């Protein structure tokens, strides 16, 4: 199974509310017609993401397909052409960032209705090979995160090896997804001793300790 993660920004002149409403209620009609979709999820940043400036993006889409052939067929379909045409209504397509990933579930709890999803966009430390980054994140760092007391669910989504070449790397190397029941649970977690240890461990495999993140409302559209 492959998961395509897309970071999208709203078109100039469109408010956050207008963007989210169109994406949530109108754009999904075009997405639903794509061939081969196994699952489709929208992540809508909550208002607090905009308090101190512009977040890394205005939305994160996650779309699952069986294999690379599925995505190739999807990209060549008439339905995908309609998706692209509809994106012009509300998305700044020049700023769109796409990464193909494989996901690993480290904490398989079920998200609660009304809960929040905390996304972190990870970039590996300079000089660290992709395979070494992914191994450390999964085998060493992941267990620290998965044991957090108030964590409901935890998923790692590293970029697939085929997304790298001698002269190209994706915009980010991985997406970390953590679910909590409430904002207060997230706040308490970030102020805890175990989370301080997680922050301290980042120097071993991440480029920056201060990484881009979003606090989101997750909306499962398909699957």
Positions of PLM-derived features:
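Macromolecular interaction modules
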Residues: 1-223
């Amino acid at each position: 199974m492959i998961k395509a993660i897309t970071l999208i920004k709203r078109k100039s002149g469109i408010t956050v509310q207008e963007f989210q409403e169109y994406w949530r209620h109108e754009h999904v009609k075009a997405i639903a017609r794509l061939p081969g979709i196994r699952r489709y999820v929208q992540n809508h940043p909550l208002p607090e993401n905009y308090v101190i400036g512009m977040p890394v993006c205005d939305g994160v889409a996650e779309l699952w397909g069986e294999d690379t052939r599925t995505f190739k067929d999807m990209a060549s379909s008439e339905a995908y052409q309609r998706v692209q045409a509809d994106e012009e209504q509300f998305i700044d397509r020049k700023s769109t960032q796409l990464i193909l990933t494989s996901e690993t579930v480290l904490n398989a709890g079920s998200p609660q209705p009304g809960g929040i999803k905390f996304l972190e966009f990870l970039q590996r430390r300079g000089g660290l090979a992709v395979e070494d980054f992914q191994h450390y994140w999964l085998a060493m760092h992941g267990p620290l995160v998965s044991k957090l007391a108030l964590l409901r669910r935890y998923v790692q989504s590293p970029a697939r090896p085929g997304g790298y070449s001698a002269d190209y790397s994706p915009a980010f190397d991985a997406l970390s997804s953590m679910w909590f029941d409430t904002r207060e649970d997230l706040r308490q977690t970030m102020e805890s001793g175990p989370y301080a240890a997680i922050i301290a461990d980042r120097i071993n495999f991440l480029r920056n300790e201060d990484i881009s993140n979003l606090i989101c409302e997750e909306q499962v559209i398909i699957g």
